[in-house]
Amino acid sequence: MQVIKDGETLRIGPLEVTAHLTPGHTAGGTSWSWKSCEEARCLHIAYVDSLTPVSSDTFLFTRNATYPNVLKDFEQSFATVSALPCDILLTPHPEASDLWSRLERREHGDPNALVDAAACRHLADAARERLLKRVVKESSEQGSAAKGT
C-alpha cells in the first residue's frame, strides 16, 4: 500500500495520474488528472470527485462539530477543480458532467462532444452555487428558530 499526497503523481504503466485533494462532500475526497494522447492529439482528463453539498437534514454545513472545516474545504476544492487542466471531465455521478447527453451527441456524429476545456470550472461554479443555496437555507432556518417562528 502507498499513501499518495496532494499533488503527487502515481505511475500506472505508461499512465501518470496526479492526485488533487478535493474534500467537501467527504473529508477524504480526491480527484485525479492525467494527459492522454491519441496519435498527435493530447487531451487533459480530470476525474473530479463529488463536489455536491448533499447530506442528511441533520448535517449542517454552517455549524458542524464533526466537520468544522467543511465550508473552507469546499472552497479549497472549488478553487482546485477550477484550476485543473480539463479537456474531458469525468465525475462519479455522470449527470454532474452531463456525460449522457455528451455521449449521445458523440453517437450522432460530434467527435468532440466530450471535449470542453471549461468543464471543470463550470462544475466547480455550479457546485459553489448549490452550496451557497444550502448555506442560505440553513442560515434562514437558524434565524427563524432563534426568533421562535
Where are these regions (language model features)?
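Metallo-beta-lactamase
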Residues: M1, T9-R11, E16-A118, H122
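Residue(s) in the substrate-gating loop at a strand-loop-helix junction
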Residues: D6
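C-terminal regulatory/interaction regions
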Residues: P111-T149
